[in-house]
Amino acid sequence: MELYSQNYLRQLENVHNTTTKGFGNKIKKIKAFEACIEKWKPRSLLDYGCGKGAMLQQLRQKYPHLHCLGYDPAVNIYSQKPKQKFDVVFCNDVLEHVEPLYLDNVLQFIEHHSKKYVWLRIDTQPANKKLSDGRNAH
């Protein structure tokens, strides 16, 4: 199942390679998610579209009991697709970056890897970044 085109993947890699700061990756900005973690008490979490892993690291620090794994095809250290399922699949500020042709596949991938819960947060405003072809990153 394809989750992205090779051309778009190269553009995302370029964005990640040319920026030092992550995007929407401050856990304090998503208090509602923290409340869900407290309520659900998951043991495992997949951060789908984790970028360079800043949010992933914050989750690991705040919830040391939680086995956290990141996946992002545009960042080499997180580019291996997970095989296992997770109590929670966390997808923060990612789906607006998915090419429309691949959106159904990405949602199926997320559903397949979730045992119990899925958290989706979609940024609907224009991004501060542009892709190399001039399109807004959102």
Model-based region annotation:
Residues 1-86, 101-107, 135-138:
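Conserved N-terminal segment of class I S-adenosyl-L-methionine
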Residues 44, 90-93:
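Hydrophobic transmembrane-helix microenvironments that flank and shape a buried ionizable site
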Residues 82, 86-91, 98-138:
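S-adenosyl-L-methionine-dependent methyltransferase catalytic module, highlighting the catalytic core
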